[in-house]
Design a protein with these regions (language model features):
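Acidic/His- and Gly-rich active-site-bordering loop/insert found
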Residues: 2-132, 151-159
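Structural signal for hydrophobic packing residues in well-ordered secondary-structure cores
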Residues: 19, 61, 65, 150, ...
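Predominant activation on well-ordered alpha-helical scaffold segments within soluble catalytic domains
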Residues: 31, 58, 140-143, 147, ...
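Acidic/histidine-rich catalytic neighborhood of metal-dependent amide-processing enzymes
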Residues: 126, 131-210, 277
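Short small-residue beta-strand/loop micro-motif enriched in glycine and branched aliphatics
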Residues: 127-129, 225-231
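Acidic-enriched catalytic cores of C-N bond-cleaving enzymes acting on peptides and small amides
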Residues: 200, 209, 230-295
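Flexible glycine/proline-rich, aromatic-decorated loop/lid segments
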Residues: 208-222
């Protein structure tokens, strides 16, 4: 009888290479993806961006019963976007998976001896290679997990799945906003799983239900045309730098505490969120950023 535990065991065997395929499990699959130099930050790689989707991801998804399409980016000069869907029953929930197959520059000459950007290399319990952690490894794991569920349940998931994989994330996801706006109905789903972010600690699987947002704006003080000499006019004319410093100081105090009430959730952090975060480890030190307790 099909079970959740059975699907997890199938996925585990595939990841560990402990299955009928032997060593050609997830590591071999990821090695093939890493070997495609699909960097979005180097000129002349357009063919590799297409090859990653058309030669690797689309055939895999189609083998699992997805209908997949590769679209040109709405903005010229940026990588294509793949969408795919597998609808078992429109009345059932739909999951949308996001990933990106492009990587940062290879920087071949900056890797230490024994490592290359487009070759998957295992050292201890770590795998090295461009895309292993950002983001080929993540979306490959998600698709492999779906494959394990399909195998366990005789070709049925019990829910619908849509996939979007872009090839311009490392250039600011240029064109993705326009693409989503134009295909909003096709990408409609009940839940989004975007596996592209850090763990709180390398050994701790992390589910993030939200991320810090940002709002960009220019804060400008224009008092006069041209500049004046501080030796002649210092202390007599208004200094725009001081005005800006006080404006920034009214937004956040010296310890990073936000002072603008409208930027904070009403009533503070919800109790459910506090409970979910209780006991959650926070990384720091080593290769990570230093955690400042007072900030």
């Amino acid at each position: 009888m099909a079970s959740r535990e059975g699907a997890i065991e199938r996925a585990r065997r595939f990841f560990d290479g402990d299955n009928a395929q032997g060593a050609s499990g997830f590591k071999a699959l990821l090695a093939e993806l890493v070997a495609i130099p699909s960097t979005a930050q180097e000129e002349g790689r357009e063919a590799e961006l297409h090859r990653y989707l058309d030669g690797a991801i689309r055939p895999w998804l189609e083998r699992l019963g997805f209908r997949a399409t590769i679209h040109p980016n709405p903005l010229p000069g940026f990588g294509p976007i793949l969408t795919a869907e597998r609808i078992e029953d429109p009345a059932r929930p739909t999951v949308l998976l996001y990933g990106h197959g492009d990587t940062v520059r290879g920087l071949d000459d900056q890797w230490r001896e024994g490592l290359k950007p487009w070759t998957l290399t295992e050292e201890g319990d770590r795998w090295y290679g461009r895309g292993t952690a950002d983001n080929k490894g993540q979306h490959a794991l998600n698709i492999a997990a779906l494959e394990a569920v399909l195998a366990e349940r005789g070709g049925k998931l019990g829910f619908n799945v849509k996939v979007v994989i872009e090839m311009a994330e490392e250039r600011g996801s240029k064109g993705l906003r326009e693409f989503v706006a134009a295909h909003a109905r096709d990408l409609a789903a009940d839940v989004l799983i975007a596996s592209d972010g850090p763990r709180v600690e390398p050994e701790v699987p992390t589910i993030a239900t939200g991320t810090r947002g940002s709002f960009h704006f220019d804060l400008v003080v224009r008092l006069r045309e041209g500049g004046v000499h501080s030796g002649h006019w210092g202390g007599l004319t208004t200094d725009p730098a001081i005005i800006l410093a006080h404006a920034l100081g009214s937004i956040m105090d010296r310890n990073g505490r936000i002072l603008v009430r409208g930027w904070l959730p009403a009533g503070g952090v919800p109790p459910a969120v506090k409970a979910g975060l209780e006991g959650c480890p926070v990384g720091g030190g080593g290769e990570a950023a230093t955690i400042d307790p007072g900030w």
